[in-house]
């Protein structure tokens, strides 16, 4: 992965660039590091391309990880609202290293075949119920970290996805109550080794989905009240600047509420848990001929209102 100086340089470059989709300027929670700080801190991104407010400096009693922050519920969110309303020192973007907004969640739940247009590109019917698989939390990396090509795979592919971050514990959650259990949303890259997903390991998807670095997340956890409609967002993936995936989250077969209801039948959802909600068409494996990632490629995954993550393949 990029070292701290390399990631800080990348965030400086990003600050000078303009992206097609406008990120939300409201409550954008981040985990970050800086040379003068001991360990990760929680922060508040001050708008598109802006610096970071150190929430732990504003309120030293706040936890320093997102999972612990979410576990404390409304009490911690009220601190963030106070921080938003206060003129606070802002760390320049060039001085911070962005981490994944959530690290070490209890679980990462993934959904397959959940875009109608993705089903059409494969000429298969839309599923009648959600197709669930998982990634291990060890696959998570930050929004500007490297994706490491494993020597075990020759068919590593891209998938941009909307990720839902759970904010409240629940089991057997009703669809009408589901959004009360959501903290917010972020951008995910469901990197996939197709040879392991589709041809090996008994065609069980897990190993092909969970190599180290196969789940970049970020750049921020955008709280649900800062997103106008999570099911009407432009979603895009570019490889080396070329648009490979371009769709809208309105193509999702099962929306956030349905997914939470379905998954919570089987497992208890905890604060910090992540649900990757599926990918639109345009992945490499279904191109003719198939196209896969190679060393030196740069992948940009972007979702309207949420932002962009940029990961180099090494």
Curated annotation (Swiss-Prot):
Cysteines engaged in disulfide bonds, as pairs: none
Domain of life: Eukaryota
Keyword line: Isomerase, Magnesium, Metal-binding, Mitochondrion, Transit peptide
Any single Gene Ontology cellular-component annotation: mitochondrion
EC number: 5.3.2.2
Enzyme category, top tier: isomerase
Cofactor note (record): Requires a divalent metal cation for activity.
UniProt-annotated location(s): Mitochondrion
Cofactor needs: Mg(2+); Mn(2+)
Gene Ontology biological process terms, A to Z: oxaloacetate metabolic process
Transit peptide: 1-84
Known catalytic reactions: oxaloacetate = enol-oxaloacetate
Binding site for Mg(2+): 159, 161, 190
InterPro entries to which the protein is assigned, alphabetical: FAH (IPR051121), Fumarylacetoacetase-like_C (IPR011234), Fumarylacetoacetase_C_sf (IPR036663)
GO MF annotation list: metal ion binding; oxaloacetate tautomerase activity
Main localization of the protein described in the UniProt heading: mitochondrion
SUPFAM superfamilies documented for this protein: FAH (SSF56529)
Physiological role: Tautomerase that converts enol-oxaloacetate, a strong inhibitor of succinate dehydrogenase, to the physiological keto form of oxaloacetate. It is thereby required to maximize aerobic respiration efficiency by preventing succinate dehydrogenase inhibition.
Family: Belongs to the FAH family.
Name of the featured protein: Oxaloacetate tautomerase FAHD2A, mitochondrial
């Amino acid at each position: 992965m990029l070292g701290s100086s390399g990631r800080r340089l990348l965030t400086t470059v990003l600050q000078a660039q303009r992206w097609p989709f406008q990120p939300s300027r409201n409550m954008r929670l981040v985990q970050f590091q800086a040379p003068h700080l001991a360990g990760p801190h929680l922060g508040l991104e001050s708008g598109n391309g802006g610096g970071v407010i150190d929430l732990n400096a504003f309120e030293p009693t706040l936890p320093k990880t997102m999972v612990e922050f979410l576990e404390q519920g409304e009490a911690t969110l009220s601190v963030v609202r106070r921080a938003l309303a206060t003129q606070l020192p802002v760390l320049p973007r060039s001085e911070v290293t962005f981490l994944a907004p959530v690290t070490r969640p209890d679980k990462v739940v993934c959904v397959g075949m959940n875009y109608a247009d993705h089903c059409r590109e494969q000429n298969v019917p839309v599923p009648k119920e959600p197709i669930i698989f998982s990634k291990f939390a060890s696959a998570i990396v930050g929004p500007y970290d490297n994706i490491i090509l494993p020597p075990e795979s020759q068919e590593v592919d891209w998938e941009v996805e909307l990720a839902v971050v759970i904010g409240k514990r629940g089991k057997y959650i009703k669809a009408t109550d589901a959004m009360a259990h959501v903290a917010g949303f972020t951008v995910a890259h469901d990197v996939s080794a197709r040879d392991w997903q589709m041809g090996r390991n008994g065609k069980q998807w897990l190993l092909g989905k969970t190599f180290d670095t196969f789940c970049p997340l970020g750049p921020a956890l955008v709280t649900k009240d800062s997103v106008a409609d999570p099911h009407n967002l432009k979603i895009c993936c570019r490889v080396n600047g070329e648009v490979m995936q371009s769709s809208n989250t309105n193509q999702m077969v099962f929306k956030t509420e349905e997914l939470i209801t379905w998954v919570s039948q089987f497992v208890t959802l905890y604060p910090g848990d992540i649900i990757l909600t599926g990918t639109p068409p345009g992945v490499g494996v279904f191109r003719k001929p198939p196209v896969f990632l190679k060393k030196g490629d740069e992948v940009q995954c972007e979702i309207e209102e949420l932002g962009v993550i940029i990961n180099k393949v090494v």
